[in-house]
């Protein structure tokens, strides 16, 4: 074996060793960054953690999900999404943790809607893959719910388009399709149901007022007739 051949083999072995080390560092680092202990090492994340443990998603059927189960895509096929999430979103949130004051829940709530929307947009981008990890082919009861689920096939909707505010403190729902189209946070319009109920209540009050007015008029007329009869007598 010539010196050149020995050098080539040495280079290949060195490259392979470095590759193994790099893969171990990347996968090990990703696993470490996905732990709940790491997520909640930032003070601001202690608030969502407490909300998670009080939600219906925690403890049901003996399942205790952590931050990563909803916010980080799992599985080797989604590893690139997990790395990108930590690299981009993680860096941004670390910066915001340093420049913002999250010392109280009230201060945290000032950015809650923005943070919730960012998380929703991630789920939208991933086709709610972390939801589907647990909720496999959901078949909701009732025609109305089944019709809504059809939107996932016909309108490009995904779980997070409708199922918001399930775990953390409630904030206004956001229209994710409109947000993507306009490149900014867009709130969902409020339901017309409340307005219709208010209109119905107003109509009922008007009818009651009219009935009351008619009754008073009839009573006044009767009293007037009685007075006339008395005068005639």
From Swiss-Prot:
Question: What does the record list as GO biological process?
Answer: anaerobic respiration
Here the segments flagged for biased composition (Acidic residues) are: 191-214, 224-233
Q: Where is this site: Interaction with NrfA?
A: 165
Q: Enumerate the residues binding heme 2.
A: 67, 70-71, 168
Q: How is it modified after translation?
A: Binds 4 heme groups per subunit.
- The residue ranges crossing the membrane are none
Q: Does the keyword Disulfide bond apply?
A: no
- Where do the annotations place heme 4 binding? 159, 162-163
Q: Which GO terms fall under molecular function for this chain's record?
A: electron transfer activity; metal ion binding
Q: Where in the cell is it found?
A: Periplasm
PROSITE patterns per the UniProt record, alphabetical: MULTIHEME_CYTC
The region annotated as signal peptide is: 1-28
Name of this protein: Probable tetraheme cytochrome c-type
This chain is encoded by the gene named cycX1
